[in-house]
């Protein structure tokens, strides 16, 4: 008789549940570990062509997986681009949600976005999408700027493009950005559960949005600006444009489950398919954000959920929208106070070359959630 059989039934059941949950918990904790390099300095990208020399690591680089470190070694100059793309993504996340209950809070250290990423909710979906998009965007732009040794502009578009224009110039290398982003960002995901599928899908949605928002730019050539012929190239969108699209997709995100209707014993092939929780809804497209868990209300502080609450947040007393005091303060009410502010005003440019301004003081009315 084995030791397991000697245990009381409630003990064996508890142990079994704990052991079953352990891989999922470990996978959740490993997701997004690479975000810890957000503030890394470009000077740490100490790379050489000699395979016998190792990448010099600072503590935050230890958060990268073996594959991620290998990709950094193989692409000199790319570490700064990845870190810069992540910083831009964080700023964009904060901008897009600045007037909502969840305002994309971040913290120093390896757990950049806090405990919310351990939940399969909409906010986690947006975080994964915007950070993936940020890396793809930054790497593609760095290629065309010549900052990465292993890539250049996208020169594949050459020759006539239309009756009065042709391809030329330096197109942003979105293909390299997407490929590197997929290899680097997705390799940080472990497991084969629904959370794993959700994160991979949202990572790809971020990259796809950068690609789909690219636009053609042209320059005219001809006598006296007659624009007889134009030279055109493909240009990346701003990350703000990408963030606007992803924010809209956050609002319309699809709640999903496994393609085999939620069984946690799906085959590998079945795991590659996500289906809407509501059978009446269309399956999520590659552009859509997906989630499987309801979001907290973010109204009050919760250490377990990692939510700060909205107490003390500034609100708009005249707005019926999400930034209004009624919604943002969760019905708790708000306080009003005045603040005297001194700002530069009536600035005048003097030739040459300085600007003179006056200091103007005015009273600002502030509304804060209770």
UniProtKB/Swiss-Prot annotation:
Domain of life the protein comes from: Eukaryota
Residues bearing carbohydrate: 29, 316, 346, 359
Expression sites by tissue: Testis and mid-gestational embryos. In the testis, detected only in postmeiotic germ cells undergoing differentiation from round spermatids into mature spermatozoa. In the embryos, expression is restricted to the developing CNS in regions of the neural tube other than the telencephalon. Expressed in osteoblast; expression levels increase with advancing osteoblast differentiation. Expressed in the brain, femur, spleen, and hematopoietic bone marrow.
Gene3D superfamilies listed in its UniProt record: 3.30.2460.20
GO molecular-function terms, A-Z: cytokine activity; protein domain specific binding; receptor ligand activity; signaling receptor binding
Record note on disruption phenotype: Important perinatal lethality, due to defects in brain development. After 14.5 dpc, embryos display dramatic malformations of the mesencephalon and metencephalon, and especially the cerebellum. They show mild midbrain hydrocephaly by 17.5 dpc. Only one out of ten live-born pups survives more than 30 days; these mice respond normally to light, sound, smell and touch, but display severe ataxia.
Subcellular location field: Secreted, Extracellular space, Extracellular matrix; Secreted
GO biological process, one term: midbrain-hindbrain boundary development
Gene Ontology cellular component terms for the protein in this record: cell surface; endoplasmic reticulum lumen; extracellular region; Wnt signalosome
Subunit architecture: Forms a soluble 1:1 complex with AFM; this prevents oligomerization and is required for prolonged biological activity. The complex with AFM may represent the physiological form in body fluids. Interacts with PORCN. Interacts with RSPO1, RSPO2 and RSPO3. Interacts with WLS.
Protein name: Proto-oncogene Wnt-1
Protein's organism: Mus musculus (Mouse)
